[in-house]
């Protein structure tokens, strides 16, 4: 019930944990740093998977699966990659009661094991491109964990593609980060800023990393997806060459891209409230709950409620009836608000007499009287569409209100406690590191969206807020998850 949930204003971190557990999305497992994803949480992941998988296939990708275990020699082949991931790796040293001749790493990501296979599959330009996605689990040995946001084991998808030239691989990088942006905004109702990471923040072994960054309700940033241009780094590490159309040997060009169950954490923190989960309809497995008010002729009310659910389901609106009598209507209202069901329909004997029902929106709690006739499915569809759009607009307005442009480091230190800060940066890793050490804020993204660049004059040259040196452009700073 919602009374178990700490308010956001009292303790945002505790609110998040309380909500995740009370809404039965996930819980702490008996294995250090791991979580149990409960059916309510996994249902959201399945909706995300279905939408993303469709989008991947529409862009020409196919699914495959590669081993969980990666030989130590594979990991060591890409020096920058292993340096970035070594502290997070879990290692298997024994199997079958004996010490292994070579240690096996449990995948923190799959570039190395996949490129060992690509080397066998690619001989000619005719074998390219390879456009493969994998749905899998990965392990990264996290010291400080938080349900969905940072756990030792988590679920994700990782795309790995191989190309004949750098132009194709860069097109792929941009195509997939745009897929993620579309998914975040159209399905999650979560506005994101798309752009590049700094060299300090990019993926280990990548030439460039593109990302989407979202703002949570505590004004912190959350990286919601990444797409990496790997250049020829992994192809060279695994000696993956192909014969070009001109008959010469060249190394393959590569990309990788991924999102994880972290998106569920982002969804919660972007939209939910002190009553519980608020879900965008496109990611809600159950969009409508019908609660009969059981007075008078109970059987007739339940029969009408079931008929209504049947009609909505027939029209593609996933609906169900809670006609149980062990809990009061008020208890049910609170319970389904906690679970984030987008629309609640209240139906009593007087409503049936009048030919109406009451529909309550989860996002605003606003109630509307609707006619109990053949137009009801269309009315409900319209409300669901309005909820989806309104959630995005509210999140966008919140981000706008918590985005600040500053001209000095003193202004920066105040503003970064309140949200995103747009400021000039001199482009050096030294300045980036000093700002992070002093404020815990990082450069989240070098924006590359035309609208965002125009809105905040990102390309306008100026003076670095920290060093006073010339700066070619502005960047987005924030504290982050």
Curated annotation (Swiss-Prot):
Catalytic activity from the UniProt record: tRNA(Pro) + L-proline + ATP = L-prolyl-tRNA(Pro) + AMP + diphosphate
Instruction: List the SMART domains.
Output: ProRS-C_1 (SM00946)
Where is the protein found, in the record's own terms?
Answer: Cytoplasm
Q: Name one GO molecular function term.
A: proline-tRNA ligase activity
Q: Which keywords accompany this UniProt record?
A: Aminoacyl-tRNA synthetase, ATP-binding, Cytoplasm, Ligase, Nucleotide-binding, Protein biosynthesis
EC category name: ligase
One GO term describing the cellular component:
cytoplasm
Biological process terms from the Gene Ontology for this record are: prolyl-tRNA aminoacylation
Q: What EC number(s) is this enzyme filed under?
A: 6.1.1.15
Cite the SUPFAM superfamilies for this sequence.
C-terminal domain of ProRS (SSF64586), Class II aaRS ABD-related (SSF52954), Class II aaRS and biotin synthetases (SSF55681)
Statement: the UniProt record of this protein carries the keyword Ligase: yes
Q: What is its main location?
A: cytoplasm
Q: What PANTHER family does the database record attribute to this sequence?
A: BIFUNCTIONAL GLUTAMATE_PROLINE--TRNA LIGASE (PTHR43382:SF2), PROLYL-TRNA SYNTHETASE (PTHR43382)
Query: What quaternary structure, including any partners, is listed in this protein's UniProt entry?
Result: Homodimer.
What family does this chain come from, according to its entry? Belongs to the class-II aminoacyl-tRNA synthetase family. ProS type 3 subfamily.
Function text: Catalyzes the attachment of proline to tRNA(Pro) in a two-step reaction: proline is first activated by ATP to form Pro-AMP and then transferred to the acceptor end of tRNA(Pro).
Q: What does UniProt say about this protein's domains?
A: Consists of three domains: the N-terminal catalytic domain, the anticodon-binding domain and the C-terminal extension.
What this protein is called in its record is Proline--tRNA ligase
In which organism is this protein found?
Answer: Pelodictyon phaeoclathratiforme (strain DSM 5477 / BU-1)
């Amino acid at each position: 019930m919602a009374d178990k949930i700490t308010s956001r204003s009292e303790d945002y971190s505790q609110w998040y944990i309380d909500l995740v557990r009370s809404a039965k999305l996930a819980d702490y497992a008996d294995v250090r740093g791991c979580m149990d994803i409960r059916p309510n949480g996994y249902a959201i992941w399945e909706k995300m998977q279905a939408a993303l998988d469709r989008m991947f296939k529409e862009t020409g990708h196919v699914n495959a699966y590669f081993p969980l275990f990666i030989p130590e020699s594979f990991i060591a082949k890409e020096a920058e990659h292993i340096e970035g991931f070594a502290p997070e790796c879990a290692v298997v040293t024994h199997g079958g009661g004996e010490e292994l001749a070579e240690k096996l790493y449990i995948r923190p990501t799959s570039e190395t094991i996949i490129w060992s296979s690509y080397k066998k599959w690619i001989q000619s330009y005719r074998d390219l491109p390879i456009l493969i996605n994998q749905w899998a689990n990965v392990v990264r040995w996290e010291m400080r964990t938080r349900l969905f946001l940072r756990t030792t084991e988590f679920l994700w998808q990782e795309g790995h593609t191989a190309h004949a030239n750098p132009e194709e691989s860069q097109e792929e990088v941009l195509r997939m980060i745009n897929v993620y942006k579309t998914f975040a905004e159209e399905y999650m109702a979560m506005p994101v800023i798309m752009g590049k990471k700094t060299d300090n923040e990019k993926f280990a072994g990548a030439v460039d990393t593109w990302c989407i960054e979202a703002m949570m309700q505590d004004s912190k940033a959350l990286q919601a997806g990444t797409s990496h241009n790997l250049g020829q780094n992994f192809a060279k590490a695994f000696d993956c060459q192909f014969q070009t159309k001109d008959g010469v040997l060249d190394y393959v060009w590569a990309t990788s891209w991924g999102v994880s169950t972290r998106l569920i954490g982002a969804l919660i923190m972007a939209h939910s409230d002190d009553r519980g989960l608020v879900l965008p309809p496109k990611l809600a497995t159950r969009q409508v709950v019908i609660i009969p008010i059981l007075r008078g002729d109970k059987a007739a009310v339940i029969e009408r409620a079931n008929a209504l659910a049947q009609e909505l389901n027939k029209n593609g609106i996933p609906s169900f009836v809670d006609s149980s009598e062990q809990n009061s209507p008020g208890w049910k209202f609170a319970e389904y608000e906690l679970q984030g069901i987008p629309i609640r329909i209240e139906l009593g004997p007087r409503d049936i007499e009048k030919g109406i029902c009451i529909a309550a929106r989860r996002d605003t709690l606003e109630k509307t009287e609707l006619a109990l006739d053949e137009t009801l499915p269309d009315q409900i569809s319209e409300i669901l569409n309005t909820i989806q759009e309104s959630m995005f607009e509210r999140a966008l307005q919140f981000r706008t209100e918590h985005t600040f442009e500053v001209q000095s480091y003193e202004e920066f230190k105040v503003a970064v406690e309140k949200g995103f800060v747009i400021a000039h940066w001199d482009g050096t890793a030294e300045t980036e590191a000093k700002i992070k050490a002093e404020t815990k804020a990082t450069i989240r993204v070098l924006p590359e969206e035309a609208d965002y660049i125009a809105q905040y004059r990102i390309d306008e040259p100026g003076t670095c807020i920290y060093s006073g040196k010339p700066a070619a452009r502005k960047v987005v700073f924030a504290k982050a998850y």
